Amino acid sequence: MTSHEEAPTESENTAAGTPEAPPAGPLGWALLFARVAAWLVVPIYFVGMVVLIILERRIGSSGEGLVEGLVLFVGFGVFAVVGGLLVAKRPGNPVGWILSGASLLVPVAAGETYAAYVMTTRGEPDWLAVVGVWANSWYWFMCVALAFIFLPLLFPDGRLPSRRWLPVAVISGVGVLIVVVLGMLSDTLRGQNVDYTVENPIGIEGLAHVEELPFFAVLSGPLLVGCLGAVAAVVVRFRRSRG
């Protein structure tokens, strides 16, 4: 190349089959993080579910019924696969992250099952058992919100149908946050399928489990608003697609 020749542009490199250099700076790191996360979603999900199944057999608990468990395993497995692909291909679309996040919350149940195993075999929890049963007190609310509220609201392009849907997203989001925080701070943590209790190291004394609070019905209001809004958003998008 002589001094008078210009360097090929990015579009010319692409047309010639020369790969473009990855973006530099924060954007490049963000894309790298998205690719790594996309590759990890499916393995983490399936390893977590296998651990859950093994632990359930160890303590003699079947958890959900066979059909319900299979539907849960396959359904959120699809979430993990599709979510990972979307995160890899369209990292700017929140739908992929929602699918991935919801799928990775399901194996959190393995932590509570481990706690049940420890309590039935040793009678005293170790730190991992405490973390597991603590996460069990709030993770399902977040998982349900991601899968049944925010996914329908933002599907498929990662945007709300219009700005008028913003209050629905905000109200349901605040409601979920309050429920999750109250679940994190409950005084006593308890088993799901095995009867045991563990003291919450960060719990507020006297604060009951979130579902037993006298005002839980009030807290359920924002979640109901979110679910109804999610269904309405799907209907609106379907009608728009049909003209």
Predicted regions and their residues:
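Alpha-helical transmembrane segments of multi-pass integral membrane proteins
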Residues: 2-243
